[in-house]
């Protein structure tokens, strides 16, 4: 499972980029979505790689994000009680593990909001004009996306 975070805004960009970000449900900077590892999603991510940071998220980071930033309709927090009542899992940690393993989908919970609204990273981005490999904040992070997500929790 990939975590995709929008890093740059879309003013004066190609309409195809804007449409792809809209399909990924990334409407604002510092919003995060979780997408499965499928060729269709990877193609969309590659198209917007100059505007997002993405990588493979692990179970612990995903559980932390769901606890702090997971929201239900009505802007209520995602709780262990809600997960216990609406899934076969006992708490958010087990639900996050099932999400990472592909056993469960974010869409299986009807009332959960698909976008995680994150804070800007503590200590800031390095630069939003260069890729991660060049010392910036854009593009493919790999497993190091967990460090960025922890700073944005």
From Swiss-Prot:
Keywords for the protein's UniProt record, in alphabetical order: Ribonucleoprotein, Ribosomal protein
Record-level Gene Ontology MF annotations: RNA binding; structural constituent of ribosome
Coiled-coil intervals, chain numbering: none
GO cellular component, one term: cytosolic large ribosomal subunit
Pfam families: Ribosomal_L30
Domain of life: Archaea
InterPro entries for the chain: Ribo_uL30_ferredoxin-like_sf, Ribosomal_uL30, Ribosomal_uL30_arc, Ribosomal_uL30_CS, Ribosomal_uL30_euk_arc, Ribosomal_uL30_ferredoxin-like
Gene Ontology process terms (BP): maturation of LSU-rRNA from tricistronic rRNA transcript (SSU-rRNA, 5.8S rRNA, LSU-rRNA); translation
Family from the record: Belongs to the universal ribosomal protein uL30 family.
Subunit structure and binding partners: Part of the 50S ribosomal subunit.
The name this protein goes by in its record: Large ribosomal subunit protein uL30
Lineage: Archaea, Methanobacteriati, Methanobacteriota, Stenosarchaea group, Methanomicrobia
Gene name for this UniProt entry: rpl30
């Amino acid at each position: 499972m990939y975590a995709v975070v929008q890093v740059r805004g879309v003013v004066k960009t190609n309409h195809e980029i804007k449409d792809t970000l809209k399909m990924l449900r990334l409407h604002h900077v510092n919003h995060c979505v979780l997408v499965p590892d499928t060729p269709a999603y990877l193609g969309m991510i590659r198209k917007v790689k100059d505007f997002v940071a993405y990588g493979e998220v692990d179970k612990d980071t995903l559980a932390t994000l769901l606890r702090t930033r997971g929201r239900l309709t009505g802007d209520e927090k995602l709780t262990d009680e809600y997960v216990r009542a609406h899934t076969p899992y006992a708490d958010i940690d087990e639900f996050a593990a099932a999400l990472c393993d592909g056993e469960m989908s974010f869409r299986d919970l009807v009332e959960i909001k698909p976008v995680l609204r994150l804070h800007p990273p503590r200590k800031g981005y390095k630069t939003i004009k260069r890729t991660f490999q060049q010392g910036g904040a854009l593009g493919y992070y790999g497993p190091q996306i967990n460090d960025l997500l922890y700073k944005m929790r």
